[in-house]
Amino acid sequence: KIPCGESCVYIPCISSVLGCSCSNKVCYKD
């Protein structure tokens, strides 16, 4: 997993368009 440098505590991952998903309050790319 690669951290996308974004948190998803209050809002979803904006970086999800790049393939990132929320895991443990942080956005990761598999």
UniProtKB/Swiss-Prot annotation:
GO biological process assignments: cytolysis in another organism; defense response
Cross-link Cyclopeptide (Lys-Asp) residue location(s): K1-D30
Classification via SUPFAM superfamilies: Cyclotides
UniProt PTM: This is a cyclic peptide.
Signal sequence, renumbered to the chain: none
Tissue expression profile of the protein: Detected in stems (at protein level).
Keyword list, A-Z: Disulfide bond, Knottin, Plant defense
Disulphide-bridged cysteine pairs: C4-C20, C8-C22, C13-C27
Domain of life: Eukaryota
Role description: Probably participates in a plant defense mechanism.
Family membership: Belongs to the cyclotide family. Bracelet subfamily.
Domain notes: The presence of a 'disulfide through disulfide knot' structurally defines this protein as a knottin.
Protein name: Cyclotide hyen-H
